UniProtKB/Swiss-Prot annotation:
Alphabetically ordered keywords of this record: Endoplasmic reticulum, Endosome, Golgi apparatus, Magnesium, Membrane, Transmembrane, Transmembrane helix, Transport
Cytoplasmic-facing ranges: 1-3, 64-132
Name of protein: ER membrane protein complex subunit 5-B
Self-association state and partner proteins as the record states: Component of the ER membrane protein complex (EMC).
PANTHER family with a match to the protein in the record: ER MEMBRANE PROTEIN COMPLEX SUBUNIT 5, PTHR21181
Known function: Part of the endoplasmic reticulum membrane protein complex (EMC) that enables the energy-independent insertion into endoplasmic reticulum membranes of newly synthesized membrane proteins. Preferentially accommodates proteins with transmembrane domains that are weakly hydrophobic or contain destabilizing features such as charged and aromatic residues. Involved in the cotranslational insertion of multi-pass membrane proteins in which stop-transfer membrane-anchor sequences become ER membrane spanning helices.
GO terms for cellular component: early endosome; early endosome membrane; EMC complex; endoplasmic reticulum membrane; Golgi apparatus; Golgi membrane; membrane; plasma membrane
Cellular compartments annotated: Endoplasmic reticulum membrane; Golgi apparatus membrane; Early endosome membrane
One example GO MF annotation: inorganic cation transmembrane transporter activity
Family recorded in the similarity comment: Belongs to the membrane magnesium transporter (TC 1.A.67) family.
Record's keyword annotation contains Ligase: no
Length: 132
């Protein structure tokens, strides 16, 4: 868990950045009123912006924790070859392969039974609807 000191440092940095943005907007509106639009920002606003950005970034780096290596070898060192590309969450057992690759004799039985059962149930439902 990140220390509250670093979180406070990030808060101070973000507050200082917001203050610098407000100061820059206020300075710009003042320059418009005095019709001196070609002047740059004062050095104190520029320095406050840079310092606040550095403080906020420094605090964020400490809150983030340990960085990982850019090399993938450190991650792959702990995995075996079997588990390297093994994603069990992508396994699908309920697919059309069971029906497509059945032996021919079992396909005929299912084909012959399916129309009769659906037709008979359809006829029965029509008859029941007519009697009501």
């Amino acid at each position: 868990m990140a220390s509250s000191i670093w979180k406070g440092l990030v808060g101070i940095g973000l507050f200082a950045l917001a203050h610098a943005a407000f100061s820059a907007a206020q300075h710009r509106s003042y320059m418009r009123l005095t019709e001196k639009e070609d002047e740059t920002l004062p050095i104190d606003i520029v320095l406050q912006t840079l310092l606040a950005f550095i403080v906020a970034c420094y605090g964020i780096v400490h809150i983030a924790g340990e960085f990982k290596d850019m090399d993938a070898t450190s991650e792959l060192r702990n995995k075996t070859f079997d588990t390297l590309r093994n994603h069990p969450s992508f396994y699908v057992f309920n697919h059309r392969g069971r029906v497509m690759f059945q032996p021919p004799e079992s396909e005929d039985c299912h084909r012959n039974q399916a129309p009769f059962s659906s037709n008979s149930s359809l006829k029965l439902s029509k008859l029941e609807a007519m009697h009501r």
